[in-house]
Amino acid sequence: MDWRHKAVCRDEDPELFFPVGNSGPALAQIADAKLVCNRCPVTTECLSWALNTGQDSGVWGGMSEDERRALKRRNARTKARTGV
């Protein structure tokens, strides 16, 4: 079975996970989306999928757009430093 069938967000309005902006009301929307992610049994799979498929917008796997960008930068620096 595909991990998406187990995702808690399937029963939520998809708009919740795609806030416009990253300040003011969008911050509250991001926090609400993360609350859904916190209840989800497939957060790890979701985040991995988002990173592997280049999902640049929205909340995926409990991480906002900015958080995923920061994670990608950290991973790239680690890879450059260690050669792994």
Curated annotation (Swiss-Prot):
Induction: Activated by CRP. Essentially constitutive over all growth phases. 2-fold induced by ethanol, repressed by SDS and heat shock. Not induced by hypoxia, slightly induced by NO and in macrophage and mouse infection, 10-fold induced by cAMP. There are 2 CRP-binding sites in the promoter of whiB1, at low concentrations of CRP with or without cAMP transcription of whiB1 is enhanced via site CRP1, then repressed as site CRP2 is filled. Changing D13A: No change in 4Fe-4S cluster, binds DNA. It is found in: Cytoplasm. Changing C9A: Does not bind 4Fe-4S cluster, binds DNA. GO terms for biological process: cell redox homeostasis; negative regulation of DNA-templated transcription; response to nitric oxide. Keywords: 4Fe-4S, Cytoplasm, Disulfide bond, DNA-binding, Iron, Iron-sulfur, Metal-binding, Transcription, Transcription regulation. Can be nitrosylated by NO, 8 NO react per cluster leading to the formation of 2 dinitrosyliron thiol complexes (DNIC). These complexes are quite stable in the presence of air. Upon aerobic 4Fe-4S cluster removal intramolecular disulfide bonds are formed. Binds 1 [4Fe-4S] cluster per subunit. This cluster is stable to O(2) but very reactive to nitric oxide (NO). Following nitrosylation of the [4Fe-4S] cluster binds 1 [4Fe-8(NO)] cluster per subunit. It comes from the Bacteria. Changing K72E: Loss of 4Fe-4S cluster, loss of DNA-binding. Belongs to the WhiB family. Homodimer. Interacts with GlgB via an intermolecular disulfide bond. This is Transcriptional regulator WhiB1. It comes from Mycobacterium tuberculosis (strain ATCC 25618 / H37Rv). The gene is whiB1.
